[in-house]
């Protein structure tokens, strides 16, 4: 499915040279960076072979550290070790203090009420902290790819608002990165599994990370992912599994509840190791604080079953919000390291009635999807696989009376773009309007591509031409077209979304453009004829209404002359002679001028009846 691949002037001296791009999963607990090499998307590891980068930054007066080194300082220097900064992104200080009252950091408010974290390196905002994490990931990618990145795609939760998304973009710019796109995390996961090119329908993305749980219900339609509903629990994750198991081991080992921090750390490390082992083994031997014991998968499942049930309750709520049933879900994508737990996979499969997709490492799946998207956006895909574009390849418009296409956004317009145009009603008392969205370069509907239809209802019942409907076409950076129709006096509106690029190949686009040139003269003549026929129909419609209301203003002879002129116009309007139709319209206008003047006089007299000259 090809669209036009655009190379901007000056972007590259060698247009066929492969550009370097990366996908970044900027996570709450851990972050990853991935790229496409030799046609395969893969996450990039550090010098020690570790793919995950803990989303932790430790600040000192002389500098900072990111990742594993920073995480070791979390307990030693709490105030200067910032973790889970993603939770703070795009929030005011008041909001943060209300949501997270137990954070170990000291905050100050900036002039506009945004949070500033007090550290040994000075006052830092969440954008700066996120930028330091992004710099570390970018450095890993630059070293692995032996060159500077041309662009990145960064993933964000589907529920992130504009402020949180803008904060993420600002962090990337501060890190010196060119953001090709922000991509919703569930969409990235679906792309990693190739679901964007598969069958249409509903997809669930079950994301159980270390500290949070998110469920997203998506609808894939014509190559577009629409987020139907999101839900989850910001205080539920794999860390809770670890703490439950650590408490169980402590009880079994008879370790006092308030033992020292070293023993608590040892307990937690043992619990994490046991949890990981129980994903493959039926039982595991645990050694901690001089105690040795056996823990079975069954015992572990009993401990975590209530937490897994909580995630499924959130899934049920999200499905209800989306207005779909569990058995309507085509695929379930698993994201987050905690989805490796067998009980989680089992219960999710039972809930949705199908085995979830687990073939891609759930820690890496979001970053891999982002890398695939980045590779496309930076221009590395061959033409036959290009799905995203920087200009509109074919004009977008609406069907108007007479089967004509009114172009609203011409082809080769750069995106994102928004254009609006006003339309009006054709008939007296018209209270609804059918909006038919078209794509193509030809003048007639029959020669263009139909994209979508929707109706605007609730238009005030006014004379023809009295209502004014503003139709707005908006194409975002992903090539997603939104069309909104609004009646200006009442504000009533309707809208639809569609992806114009879906299902078109380069050859089809080229053919449509070539046809528009080959048939240009013929199309202009056809349009002129259609326009005259529409005008003839409008004139006759208006005349019939006037005669029905005020025929008494005419003598029999006058009425006959007008009827003859109207009959002649009706007859020639059935033919293909543009000039004859135009002359017949002019003749009707000439024969009805006196009638129109009398109707106007009558309307004025009615309006003035009962009023004095002074009142006027």
From Swiss-Prot:
Q: Keywords assigned by UniProt?
A: ATP-binding, Chaperone, Nucleotide-binding, Stress response
In this entry, which stretches build a coiled coil? none
Where on the tree of life does the source sit, at the highest rank?
Answer: Bacteria
**Keyword check for Phosphoprotein:** no
Q: Which cellular components does GO assign to this protein?
A: cytosol; iron-sulfur cluster transfer complex
Question: What's any GO biological process attached to this entry?
Answer: chaperone cofactor-dependent protein refolding
* One Pfam family, short name: HSP70
SUPFAM superfamilies referenced in this protein's UniProt entry, alphabetically? Actin-like ATPase domain, Heat shock protein 70kD (HSP70), C-terminal subdomain, Heat shock protein 70kD (HSP70), peptide-binding domain
Specify the inducers: By cold shock.
Q: Which InterPro entries match?
A: ATPase_NBD, Heat_shock_70_CS, HscA_NBD, HSP70_C_sf, HSP70_peptide-bd_sf, Hsp_70_fam, ISC_FeS_clus_asmbl_HscA
**UniProt GO molecular function:** ADP binding; ATP binding; ATP hydrolysis activity; ATP-dependent protein folding chaperone; heat shock protein binding; protein folding chaperone; unfolded protein binding
Q: Does the keyword tRNA-binding apply?
A: no
Spell out the NCBIfam families in the cross-references: HscA (TIGR01991), PRK05183.1 (NF003520)
Report the protein's function. Answer: Chaperone involved in the maturation of iron-sulfur cluster-containing proteins. Has a low intrinsic ATPase activity which is markedly stimulated by HscB. Involved in the maturation of IscU.
Matching PANTHER family = HEAT SHOCK PROTEIN 70KDA
Family under the similarity heading:
Belongs to the heat shock protein 70 family.
Instruction: Give the protein name, as stated in the record.
Output: Chaperone protein HscA
What is the originating organism of this protein?
Escherichia coli (strain K12)
